Design a protein with these regions (language model features):
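Cell-envelope and extracellular/periplasmic
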Residues: 1-119
């Protein structure tokens, strides 16, 4: 049997916010990752749900968070198959990872984004 992948979720970027060189390379790396994933899965139009990384305000190590966030916004703006999902209002356990209630909220937002793409 085979299956069809409805969408991909990408929720990463905080680690890249901790070093300027990584943050500056993030946009290009993200574009390459999305292109390679689509090529591997055989679908140029694979929808990707991109969760906006944290702003780093609660974590001084994430000094370059805004560079990563801007890269994410640019990738989503340039690719009609990428939907940016905001998580700024969710609660973090350790300055990076969401607590259980916020994981559920994010899951609902992601499901809603997939369903909205169908319509």
């Amino acid at each position: 049997e085979s299956c069809e992948i409805e969408a991909m979720v990408w929720c990463q970027g905080e680690a890249d916010s901790t070093r300027l060189e990584w943050a500056e390379a993030y946009k290009t790396n993200l574009q390459h990752l999305f292109a390679a994933t689509r090529a591997d899965l055989g679908g140029e139009k694979l929808p990707i749900l991109l969760v906006l990384s944290g702003d780093g305000k609660a974590n001084p190590a994430m000094a370059d968070a805004e560079i990563v966030r801007q890269a994410q916004r640019k990738v989503a703006s340039a690719d009609s198959q990428v939907t940016l999902v905001n998580a700024d209002d969710l609660t973090l356990l350790d300055h990076v990872h969401y607590d259980a209630a916020s994981q559920l909220k994010l899951g609902h937002r992601l499901a809603e984004a997939v369903l909205n793409r169908r319509n």
